[in-house]
Structures are given as C-alpha cells and as structure tokens.
Design a protein with these regions (language model features):
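Surface-exposed peri-terminal alpha-helical interaction modules
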Residues: 2-174
C-alpha cells in the first residue's frame, strides 16, 4: 500500500459580496424602498408638511426646518449610493469607478448637532415617521456599504489543520 498524499486545496474563486448583491432581487427591493421613501418625503415636505409646519410654535418650526434639512441630506446620500450601486449592477460603472464616486458622495456615519428627542417629539407625526424610516434605511445601507467596500483586507490563506496533522504523521512514520 502506497503513501497517500492528502492536500488541502481551495481553488474556488472568492465570491465578492458586492458584485453578487447589486445584481440580486434583494438589492432591487432595497432600491425601490429607498426611491419610494425619497418620493414620499418630497411629496410630504412640498404638501402636507409645509401646511403642518405653519401651525407649529416658533421653536418647533426651527426644529422642523433643521430636521427636514437633515432628512433630505440623508435621503440624498441614500439615493446617490443606490444609484451608483445600480449603475454597477447594470454595467454602466465598474467597481473602481464606483469607488471613485464613493469618495465624492460619502455616506455620513454621524449627524452632528442632532435635535434633542424632546424637540423632535413636538414635530408632526408624519415627519417623525419619515425621519425614523430614513434612519433605519441609512443604517442598513451603511452596513451594506461596509460589506461591499474594497477597503477590507483580503483574508490570508490558512493552512488546513488536517493537512498539518497529516504532515506530522508523515514525518513521524515516514
């Protein structure tokens, strides 16, 4: 009986999450959700929101103005990210071109000078709901962006523990 040579091989190419995600049905649903939220927010701020803001006390009206600006900024970042990812999915942009676009429009991870919750509580419920929805969507997109990002280090190849044990046996027993 001859010596059996066992080798650990993993020659499968690494699956890049970003490339597969932007082509998935999940991304299409996320895209629709994001763009729908942008449209709903624009319709609200141009219609009922404008009317509701006129009924607010002065301090609440100032909070309304600052929170609606934060909301639209957050939604512009979301829409920009979604459009870049869709362009990658449809072959209009390469991953490297998308990375360049990412440096132009950054997803902010923190919002400075956020209004106190007690002030936000005085805002119309419709605006509060849009703010909450946009924050949840923004958090999801930040998470996805970190997963897709090429900034993560490439994992180093690992030696198979089975191969190492087999090698020790081969050395010990020839």
């Amino acid at each position: 009986m001859g010596v059996m040579d066992v080798m650990f091989r993993d020659e499968q190419p690494t699956v890049r999450f970003g490339e597969t995600f932007v082509a998935s049905e999940s991304f299409k649903m996320l895209f629709r959700e994001g763009m729908t939220l942008v449209e709903e927010t624009a319709a609200y701020l141009d219609g009922p929101g404008r009317d509701e803001s006129r009924l607010l006390a002065r301090h609440a009206a100032l909070t309304y103005a600052s929170e609606s600006m934060r909301l639209t900024t957050r939604l512009m970042q979301i829409a920009s990210w979604l459009l870049v990812q869709r362009a990658v999915s449809e072959g209009e942009l390469s991953l490297s071109e998308a990375a360049e676009e990412k440096t132009r429009v950054r997803l902010s991870t923190a919002e400075p000078n956020e209004s106190a919750p007690v002030l936000v509580a005085e805002l119309p419920l419709s605006l509060q709901a849009l703010i909450a929805q946009s924050k949840r969507l923004h958090a999801r997109i930040l998470h996805l962006d970190r997963l897709i990002s090429d900034d993560r280090p490439t994992p180093e190849p690992r030696v198979s523990p089975v191969f190492a044990q087999h090698d020790m046996l081969r050395v010990a027993f020839g």
